[in-house]
Amino acid sequence: MIRVIQRVVVIVCMVLQAQTALAEGLQEIAVALAYPRKEVIAKIAERKGGDVVSALILERALIRKRADRAQGSPCEQVEDSLKSGCLLLVSANAISDGRFDDLRGIFATLDTRAKNQLFQLVPVALFEKLAALSPTRLISQAETNIALSTESEGFLQDSTKPVVDIEINGQKVSGALDTGASVTLISEQDARQLELTPLHYDAEIGTYYRAGKVKAALYQIKELKIGNTQMRDVVVLVGGQMTLIGLDMISRFDSLYLSPERIAINLSAHELASLEKECRARVFLNSDFMRFNQFLYFIAKVDGKSTIVALDSGYSGDYLATAIMPQGAVRDITSSGVVNDARGAAYEQPYSAEVEVEAGNKTIRMPAIFSGTRKLPAPYVLGWRGFSHYHLVYNVKSARACLI
């Protein structure tokens, strides 16, 4: 069987700095955002106002919902060594939620040091551009159920795809609901037929499965509808050859259920509670400060060794991708070796081996694919085919997620 891998994971490369270039307090927070270990969180929480910062980190990581939702800046009582980091987290949340009007108020509270640290992570031009925009508004939100089929345009496929209908400014396009995409991306082809407002800011996107960069640009959509969720004044990137609904947009739903048979958005309270009772393994969010790079992951044992496995519904080609050549791997002769992503088609030489994945007392044997041309976000990535064994339940509103 010829198998074509079609995949892009979005990373926005907007002058991001290495963690080692950050001030000490920011380094601690950056480490905790990547992998929130108890000892790191505890060290932050011990300091003045550290409980506020740790609560922001834990909520971002999908570990615990913040209890304190008082009006005003949550960072007012935070000590100086953590204050800049706290304000950066709040700024990032505002950008991710589309609360661009809040950015102006946050910026007014920054001292010179905090501004300098902010602009290490976000270019001044981008911050000013976003702060001047109208905030994204949620117009309506209701439950949506999408049954997925292996039939496409009269032909049978060997698996379903997480494709949903999207309405942009009244015109319909299709896009992948992609848990492996940091941000939402509209393809150049789709953008040409839509009435989008250019924001005159250029960026770059990169791919995990073909290491490289593609030029993109910032646009604002007047009206966006995904299922029964309707929003106005939504900021997206335009570039490349694939339209993807990324984690920034997914995080604006109340909840999400994702399996090869069905996609459900904004589930009823009863169904969501019922699904959460079946949870086998916790799912967390890894992110940088500004959420320009972020991915969902779970902890599993692969061939008996504990490791991180990212969740990527947009990676449709395989069950499991690996950044490490598996023991006993052989050339994968079932693959065409063709990879399609935002930069077009390319050829790779994949190798495969059967591995044992154990998560939440559920053990599955599945093929793991290795290719030297890929730059993965984690040691292993569960692709769309792997979702047949592990379904995602994402309770966005309560800041928790799991696999069933």
Regions found by a protein language model. Give the residues of each.
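Bacterial N-terminal signal peptides
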Residues: 8-17
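Bacterial N-terminal signal peptides that target proteins for export
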Residues: 1-9
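Pepsin/retropepsin-fold aspartyl endopeptidases
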Residues: 22-404
